């Protein structure tokens, strides 16, 4: 289930239990308290773009800090694509690029249409459920790496998404950047 949020009403009216703030914190807490709620849509979009009541600022800084994956439509298809292949770091005139090959697919529904790139510290445990590690969601089978001093070790992890947002198993590579 997805909830429709009226941006003007949310920022215009005070929280009944804390009149010094608007309703956004309580609405977000309530929405996140129920596992059956998959997210929300904001109405009307121009109010978000115009940043009415600093609504957009709050979404960016507090509630949606990190990229997110669209919920899986597993009631239509729950088969994830195969994992990416041949992942490697290549030096180009634009710097280091992480390249990979799209997985093979038997049907159109199994084709990879996007890739998720995660970055973890060298000794950090890989946790794909933590969106703070997502550095890119891309249609391209490559990612420009942020080269630093060449001494810091990272683990990059790439997964493939099909058109119904099923996520493949991960492939990882340790890199010095």
Across the structure, where does each feature detected by a protein language model lie?
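Substrate-binding cleft of secreted/luminal carbohydrate-active enzymes
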Residues: 1-75
């Amino acid at each position: 289930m997805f909830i429709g949020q009226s941006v003007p009403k949310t920022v215009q009216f005070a929280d009944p239990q804390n009149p010094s703030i608007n309703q956004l914190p309580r609405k977000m807490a309530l929405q996140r308290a129920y596992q059956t709620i998959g997210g929300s849509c904001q109405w009307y979009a121009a109010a978000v773009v115009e940043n009415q009541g600093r609504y957009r600022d709050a979404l960016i800084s507090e509630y949606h800090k990190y990229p997110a994956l669209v919920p899986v439509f597993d009631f239509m298809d729950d088969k994830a694509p195969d994992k990416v292949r041949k992942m490697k770091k290549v030096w180009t005139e634009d710097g280091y690029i992480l390249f990979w090959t799209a997985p093979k697919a038997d049907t159109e529904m199994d084709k990879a249409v996007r890739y998720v790139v995660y970055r973890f510290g060298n000794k950090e445990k890989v946790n794909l459920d933590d969106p703070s590690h997502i550095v890119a969601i891309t249609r391209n089978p490559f990612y420009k790496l942020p080269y630093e001093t060449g001494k810091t070790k990272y683990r990059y992890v790439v997964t493939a998404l099909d058109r119904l947002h099923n996520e493949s198993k991960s492939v990882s590579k340790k890199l010095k950047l």
